[in-house]
A protein has these predicted regions:
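Conserved beta-loop-beta/alpha segment of the NTase-like Rossmann-fold superfamily
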Residues: 1-40, 64-67, 71-76
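Weak global preference for isoleucine
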Residues: 2-4, 8, 22-25, 36, ...
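Catalytic-core segments of class I nucleotidyltransferases/pyrophosphorylases
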Residues: 13-14, 42-149, 153-154, 160
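Secondary-structure boundary/capping residues
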Residues: 21, 99, 135, 167-168
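Short, amphipathic C-terminal "tail helix"
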Residues: 149-150, 155-176
Length: 176
């Protein structure tokens, strides 16, 4: 999953207190995703890749959990794939009436990257956006620098030792 937004995390983290919060977006093909059914904006059901229509609200894969999540995960049973499923954790919060839902707005972009085709589409979209804007989109190094987790000298040293390619050239031009 790939998200592009300037404000989604900062505003939601500030307001998040207890329980779990999941993010949704309306899609035209809900059978490809986990979806959530809402009644009066209250979550009532989560279904992974529903065969019959229940909702267009796809669960995007962006979640916030409180400190109870770890202990709740320890109680989950592995799925048929022998994995603990995030949907099952969300269902526990739903059952306990501790699940809240936020919808992504029109200024936020979500791209599924769960298939080869959707990953390629997402990569091409970001490449085109970077080319048009002339700046990096979604760079973890640049975000770390802008948030004060990396100093300019540390980032420049990192770039100096990195491969010489357009990504690192653009990263360097973003901070100099």
């Amino acid at each position: 999953n790939i998200f592009i937004s300037d404000k989604i995390v900062s505003s939601e983290v500030v307001n998040f207190k207890k329980g779990a919060r999941i993010f949704t977006i309306s899609v035209k093909d809900p059978e490809r995703y986990g979806v959530i059914k809402l009644l009066n904006n209250i979550p009532v059901e989560i279904v992974e890749k529903p065969k019959e229509f229940i909702s267009n609200n796809a669960v995007t894969g962006l979640y916030f959990y409180d400190t109870e999540a770890t202990s709740l995960c320890k109680k989950l049973k592995p799925s048929n794939r022998n994995e603990l499923e995030i949907t099952d954790l969300n269902k526990v919060y739903l059952k306990n009436e501790m699940l809240s839902v936020s919808s992504l707005g029109e200024s936020e972009t979500w791209m599924d990257a769960g298939t080869f085709e959707s990953l390629l589409d997402a990569g091409n979209y970001i490449a085109a956006l970077q080319k048009r804007l002339g700046r990096l989109v979604g760079s973890p190094e640049l975000t770390s620098y802008n948030q004060g987790f990396l100093s300019k000298s540390d980032l420049l040293e990192f770039i100096k030792n990195a491969p010489n390619n357009s990504y690192y050239q653009l990263l360097k031009s973003s901070i100099t």
